[in-house]
Amino acid sequence: MIARLILIVFAINFSVLADDDKISLSLLNAELKKNYAFVERSLNKSQMKIDNSSGKIFFDETGITINVLTPFKENYRIEGGMIEIHDLFLDQKQLINVDQANNFFLNILIKGIDENNPSYRVNIVNNDIIEIMSTEQNALVSFLFYKNRLELIRYTDSIGVEHGIELRPL
């Protein structure tokens, strides 16, 4: 009787622990609101060139701040439907409406993921990748996890440049 009870308790605990290891949209949305240091690598296939940039991304109650530290110092502030771009080297600022940017990845970053949104499909692959496929723009964004931590984001932009963004929590 005691052995059976121990076996049942073990099975319940194991199933709870196994569920903790599964990635989900709620985990992705939580990970997308953390502050990170990042290294972004982009491959322009037409020029066969890889560019690198690095910086930090911060989330707060009203928006997102992205500080690019290399190769050029730029700050981006996304708030209230607008993107402010500040080129620190040239000391120039520009405002862009988020809707005019028409960027699938940016919209995911701002709004998060809702599995019932008809403008994209969600696919979980091998319990370590969440793919978001736009039904309107034929765009795919992949979020790669390691031990339930968002480690890498991959996407191809509208001009065919492939991007990989490695993340490290701050």
What are these regions (language model features)?
Residues 28-48:
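A short, Trp-centered hydrophobic/proline-enriched beta-strand micro-motif
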Residues 123-170:
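Gly/Pro-enriched, hydrophobic low-complexity segments
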Residues 16-18:
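Boundary at the C-terminal end of the N-terminal hydrophobic targeting segment
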Residues 4-13:
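Sec-dependent N-terminal signal peptides
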Residues 90-129:
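Flexible, surface-exposed loop/linker segments and immediately adjacent secondary-structure boundaries
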Residues 32, 58-63, 78-82, 125-127, ...:
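Short, solvent-exposed coil/turn segments at beta-strand boundaries
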Residues 40-42, 70-72, 80-82, 89, ...:
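A mature extracytoplasmic/lumenal domain signature
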Residues 56-104:
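An acidic-aromatic
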